[in-house]
Amino acid sequence: MASQVSPGVVLRERDLTNATIVGASSLTAAFASSFQKGPIGEIVSISSEKQLVSVFGTPKEANAEDWMVAAEFLGYGGQLAVVRAETGCLNAGSSAGVLIKNDLEWQAGVGAANTFVARTAGSWGNSLKVVAADRGADQILTLASAPATTALGTAFTTVSGKGGRIYSFDAASNELAVILDNPGSLITSADIFDEPGDGVATSVTAGAYAGLGSQNGTHTVDPTGGSGTGLRLDVTIDAGGAVTGVAIVAGGQDYEQGDVVTCAAAGLGTGASSDLQVTISAVTNDNIAVNSVKDWYTNTEIAGTGLKLSAIGPRPGTSEYASARGLAYDEMHVAVIDTTGDVSGAANTILERFTYLSKLSDGKSSEGSLAYFKDVINQESQYIFQGASLANTIEPSSAGGGEALGSDSSALSSGDKFLLLAMNTTDLSGGTDDYAYTAGEAVAAYEFFSDTENTEVDFVLMGGSMASESDTLTKAQKVVAIAALRKDCLAFVSPHKGNQISYSGSALSSADQRANTLNFFNSITSTSYAVLDSGYKYMYDRFNDKYRYIPCNGDVAGLCVNVSTTTADWISPAGLNRGGIRNVIKLAFNPNKADRDELYQARVNPIVSFAGTGAVLFGDKTALAAPSAFDRINVRRLFLNIEKRVEALAKGVLFELNDETTRYGFLSTINSYLAEVSALQGITDYLVVCDSTNNTPEVIDRNEFVAELFIKPARSINYVTVTFTATRTGVSFSEVVGR
């Protein structure tokens, strides 16, 4: 169509190089269960057993079957998409247990009333101690005796004029931790500690007084007001009503210089018309010798851990960002400590530390990255969230005026200092476990994998059995339903544990095991998107130092991963060459030939242990009951492979023009890929139709694009017949064979 209105040349480019199909780099299995820890109701990608332990914890007695199925699959080179089921577990918090399923719930405000809370649910969080520390106190003074007042924040001075506030006092050792007004002028053992607070009045001055009436004489008065108690004065007044003298009868206690006390008029004689104001001009305080001095930060132990604050990092101070704005004392450290060893294996291990964070909500590190402590912890910590404001803050000097944590630098002025935390410790508690998920909870967890657009998986693993056969069947049917609904993956299902292993009494006979297994699988829907196996293997659980029976659905899926890695998706995973099951001491049910015949006819792939070969997957059927090319694993996986790649290419055709060029580009790319599959023994022949015969004008007018693929899949050998014929010596073989 003309696009110019005057003579000229238009150059156009058409890109047909984007029609490329890329093979899968990894195979992922969907899996859901209860765990020791980890986010709930969220799909997490796991690529190794080490990562499985790190994110979801080690297996416990109640979830070991599930956990080890997942671990065995990972051992074959697969990856997992894991969902932790929502059960009755709670996160450990600073105030009480609370359920915070995942990061999204935390961001929505769930559990934010806790100062700190374990990042995921489970009793594991009860072992956590969170330590937040800033520059804190400056020194620890060992005094000759205990001061009268040792409350947090009490102002004090030394005889030489050094001052500050009290942070803490240990009565057993007379050790007083102090925050100095001027940290550059440290207290030494030569200094004398002046009792903080108030003292005994030693000198008073009477204010102006104009009384009327006969007030002459000396009157003993107990004045009111001031910061102390117990002061008693003798006030002498002449006949004219003038105060001629004030004498201290009792100096009281806890008064401060400059206090003004009131002598009521009624106490000064008959006819007095006004009160007398008296100023305390001097007080006497007790002085205490300083026996020794040491640095607070490097000598302060984190209670109950045996660790010093210096184990977290050097003393925090003021960041470059704050200093450039004239602010001070914004830096702080946060550490998470495993007090019991339940998380790390060793008690009082520092699990993680965040150093040189900022109390400024807009704080930045020296590299320019985010430094506000709340944001850094909530975004980067593997163990905790930080919610409510930290408690027990203290003024940075006796002058007061400390700024609140979380202030923005734009709201502060040069010279401002932040309130100090010194050492703020929080022990988390209230975390609970609940490994025994119900059938409903299992179904809800697997439902996260229903969405094909947002979650790409190749397999769905059933995992272990549940408490009852009916619950196990419900779980199995859900796994199969997910795969059948998605139509882009295979479900792998094992029988109920009780079908093959007796929980009490005598062991089950082979006939009982076969009958139980067949009865269980009879209820499974016929579909080519599922694979059924007969196996429970006996293996060692290194985490709990015991042997367990574990279902083999993770192994069978793992064999598919292995065959895809070493050969191709369309090669059968069964047999002596490729079907070896790993980590097998023995099988709970080792079916003989008669058992295998019944199992295979019922869509169940036997797992067999032959002498000298170990345990082997000895069948490659899908769960499809009707005879079909899709009743074999390799054919179903062949079509899944081709369908996924054709779908990816077809998405690139969307919104293009349905013309010969587009159809040819699509056709040539599909033919190229199928030729490669054919060369690798996946198919014996194929035909792709994508031209004007099936993209008619009517199809084009409906904005449709049609392609048809005809494929002859390669078939695996399931039945071998070898005939031996004995002949007489003089007989020619051509006569016997007939050729």
Where are these regions (language model features)?
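Short, surface-exposed beta-strand/loop "edge" segments at domain boundaries and coil↔beta transitions
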Residues: 17-18, 37-42, 52-53, 89-92, ...
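Broad, structure-driven detector of short, well-ordered beta-strand segments within folded domains
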Residues: 126-134, 231-235, 274-278, 307-310, ...
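Structured, mid-chain assembly/scaffold modules that mediate subunit interfaces
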Residues: 60-140, 147, 165, 177-195, ...
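Short amphipathic beta-strand/extended segments with alternating polar/hydrophobic composition
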Residues: 100-105, 125-133, 165-169, 192, ...
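Short, ordered beta-strand-loop transition motifs
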Residues: 35-37, 100-112, 134-139, 167-175, ...
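Beta-strand-rich solenoidal segments
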Residues: 292, 298-378
